[in-house]
Regions:
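Conserved phosphotransfer microenvironments
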Residues: 30-55, 65-66
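Structural motif
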Residues: 4-10, 36-42, 62-65, 83-85
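Short, charged N-terminal beta->alpha structural module
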Residues: 1-25
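The C-terminal output helix
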Residues: 94-102
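Short, charged/polar "capping" segments at the starts of alpha-helices
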Residues: 10-15, 42-46, 67-71
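Short, structured coil segments at secondary-structure junctions
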Residues: 18, 55, 74-77
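Proline-centered loop/turn at the N-terminus of a beta-strand
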Residues: 56-60
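Output/docking surface of receiver
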Residues: 66, 73-94
């Protein structure tokens, strides 16, 4: 599964079977099944999603508080995770894979 992040996340948090690429490393990430964004990267994601993502993809937003959720809900984000719970990122990836990508 290809995951592209638009924000800095410790790659050691991800299961080894996931191919994780940070968008800013090359600026040329493609074929994302899942994209991970935060409040600071939402507009960059919107500008680049057609060239970065597969036709069918899932977006996961990392939120810090309720105001982040309010900002994201108008962008059609598929799933959310609190930044305090980021160590559980694999659980949400597996969940969205089963429910939205299968």
């Amino acid at each position: 599964m290809n995951i592209v992040t638009f924000c800095q996340i410790d790659e050691s948090l991800f299961n080894p079977e996931f191919k994780v690429e940070y968008f800013h490393t090359t600026g040329e990430a493609t074929d994302a099944d899942i994209v991970i964004i935060d409040i600071d990267s939402i507009f960059e994601f919107e500008e680049n999603k057609t060239k970065v993502c597969k036709e069918k993809f899932v977006s996961i937003a990392i939120i810090d508080d309720e105001s982040d959720y309010e900002a994201f809900k108008n962008f059609g984000i598929d799933a959310w995770i609190r930044s305090a719970d980021i160590s559980q990122i694999n659980n949400i990836i597996n969940l969205v894979n089963k429910r939205l990508l299968s």
